[in-house]
Amino acid sequence: MIKIKKGLDLPIAGAPAQVIEDGKPVTQVALIGFDYNGMKPTMEVKVGDRVKCGQLLFTDKKTEGVRYTSPASGVVSAVNRGERRVFQSIVIDIEGDDSEQFAQFSPEELPNLSREQVVENLVGSGEWTALRTRPYSKAPAIDAEPHSIFVTAMDSHPLSADPAVIINEAKADFKNGLVVLGKLTRGKVFVCARAGVNYDLPSGSNAVQEQFDGPHPAGLAGTHIHYLDPVNASKFVWTIGYQDVIAIGRLFTSGRKSVERVVALAGPMVSKPRLLRTRTGASLAQLTEGELKSSDVRLISGSVLGGRNAKGNVSFLGRFANQISCLEEGYKREFMGWLSPGSNKYSLLNIYLSKLNPGKLFNFTTTTNGSERAMVPVGSYEKVMPLDILPTQLLRSLVVGDTEMAQKLGCLELDEEDLSLCTFVCPGKYEYGPILRDSLTRIEKEG
């Protein structure tokens, strides 16, 4: 077991009850372009076309052969683009339950499949896009082979669902998915779990379980990779979420694309925080109808630390999101707030009275408590960074655009979510995730 000491478990109110209930039916789903870094689509459908679940919607110009398929049966109602025609989302009005049929195998046949059979089925169904490379966090090339694969079977995000609850409902599918993933690498398939949790892994496979303990980010793939199989510019690993492993297991044994997704609906503004069974790309406005304490709420697809503001053309559940976080919009300004003793405010530093009550939970809002200012190194980053890197120096290199120094300091190991705590504790209010993404894009482009 690997124990993480540095990090931060955000004391936020509204944690979900770990009980799965059926969510409200939704009539719209969408595939969000921002979920796929560096992807440039070539559309194969247009508004008004009828599609089946699993049918091809578009391919990626930059990664040849990678297919993005429909998460529902219905009619394409919108293809949304932003400035400079950047692809935002493709929306489907759900009608019927028609599905494309893919290759189907019995569980006994899975260990004997070839790598080519596995790749063909994953690519054809669109489940290939559940895999992400590290470095760069992109859909892998079809002919690529990773040094190892990391299954994130734990979640340390604030307000997250317990993966064990979801996996225990689909043990057979999870095992079948691990068998399939094992065909993609000659290395190990690391199943990373919370301390004290033991999953039933398939015998005779290359799947091994590793346990992590400690505060967030103990549950992030970047942390697991750093300690178990570090990457560099010429060494790649792949990551995948536990619910996508279940979906892959179902795909290979049923021949149909699985779009079920269990998410945590949680946060200070949720009337009844709990786990909901819904579908990939579900409309969050429809899913959360009647669930919120007020209308002035920001819906976040994903974690409060690194999720996406779900509004407008992207008001849908993200491809890799396992939670819906709901926070009150922080419009209100507090007169002379910097002079208050802060009994109801939280800070990592010992500057508020609330530190005298360490078990207190807070109703966080979206306010940043101030405007952007200079980056001040007061030791906050070091307190929340468990990786063996120099966070202040790395962040400074990213901010000034020194990609050469950033590579030397370890930026290739990181994804946006790995710097989300640094963003939260930053006195200068910097958003380090987008800054890291810009640097990674430049590094990949320039070599």
From Swiss-Prot:
Keywords, sorted A to Z: Ion transport, NAD, Sodium, Sodium transport, Translocase, Transport, Ubiquinone
Chloroplast found in the keyword field: no
UniProt entry tagged with the keyword Lyase: no
GO biological process annotation, one example: sodium ion transport
Catalytic activity: a ubiquinone + n Na(+)(in) + NADH + H(+) = a ubiquinol + n Na(+)(out) + NAD(+)
GO molecular function, one term: oxidoreductase activity, acting on NAD(P)H, quinone or similar compound as acceptor
InterPro entries noted in UniProt: NqrA (IPR008703), NQRA_2nd (IPR056148), NqrA_C_domain (IPR022615), NQRA_N (IPR056147)
Family to which the UniProt record says this protein belongs: Belongs to the NqrA family.
Assembly and interaction partners: Composed of six subunits; NqrA, NqrB, NqrC, NqrD, NqrE and NqrF.
UniProt name for this protein: Na(+)-translocating NADH-quinone reductase subunit A
Taxonomic classification: Bacteria, Pseudomonadati, Pseudomonadota, Gammaproteobacteria, Oceanospirillales
